A protein has these predicted regions:
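Basic, helix-initiating cap at the start of DNA-binding domains
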Residues: 2-31
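Residues in the recognition helix of alpha-helical DNA-binding motifs
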Residues: 23, 55, 65
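Short, basic, alpha-helical segments at the C-terminal edge of helix-turn-helix-like DNA-binding modules
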Residues: 37-38, 66-75
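Amphipathic alpha-helical packing segments from all-alpha helical-bundle domains
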Residues: 115-140, 145-160, 186, 190
């Protein structure tokens, strides 16, 4: 009986947190996180203020939990796909990343949007940068002075891709998006090295 009650409570807590997350994502489309009040959020999702305070001390606390959970899922994707040159681990990592974003599409879209959290965007950048440095080094063993520019190009391209997909790509599956992003990165790598070597021959 006690275990059953616990499961029921857990389910209710999950439902409440999910409603708050959705409500926050919707409000963040209109205004910055600093302007959103607890009253506004609980009214939007039809939950008591006391229920909100049972789980969070304030709006930034709620946002921090949401961001941390997403980051943990992305970190897990990184751990599960260590770089293995010659294998498609990079592709599977990208696919997992898109799955995490897809499962959190509303809030992820709000976070990278105009009223989003620049701190979250930076964390996402760091995560992608670590992985892209690792994967590019695996794809292209020699280090050159141009690599930092190439990292920057790939990183910003990936971030732009993610933003566009979150905002407009509801009908495109994470697999489809991952395939497309992967093709773009690989073709950039290939083109970068082909033209570089081509020029040196002339």
């Amino acid at each position: 009986g006690e275990e059953k009650m616990q499961k029921k409570t857990d389910r209710r807590v999950r439902k409440t947190k999910s409603q708050l997350k959705t409500g926050l994502a919707q409000l963040m489309r209109e205004k910055s996180i600093r302007e959103i009040t607890v009253k506004e959020l609980v009214d939007a999702v039809d939950i008591n203020r006391s229920t909100f305070y049972l789980h969070y001390s304030d709006i930034p606390g709620l946002l921090a939990e949401i961001e941390n959970e997403m980051m943990e899922e992305m970190q897990r994707a990184i751990r599960e796909h260590p770089i293995d040159p010659g294998k498609d681990t990079v592709y599977y990592f990208i696919q997992d990343l898109f799955h995490v974003l897809d499962e959190n599409r509303q809030i992820a879209s709000a976070l990278v949007g105009p009223h989003g959290d620049i701190g979250f965007v930076h964390k996402l950048e760091q995560l992608l940068e670590e992985k892209s440095r690792e994967s590019l080094a695996a794809l292209v063993p020699e280090k050159s002075g141009e690599m930092k520019y190439f990292y920057s190009y790939c990183l910003n391209g990936c971030l732009g891709f993610v933003k566009t997909w979150l905002e407009t790509g509801e009908n495109e599956t994470p697999e489809y998006a991952a395939e497309m992003a992967y093709r773009m990165v690989v073709s950039s790598v290939t083109a970068f090295y082909d033209t570089k070597e081509g020029r040196e021959d002339n």
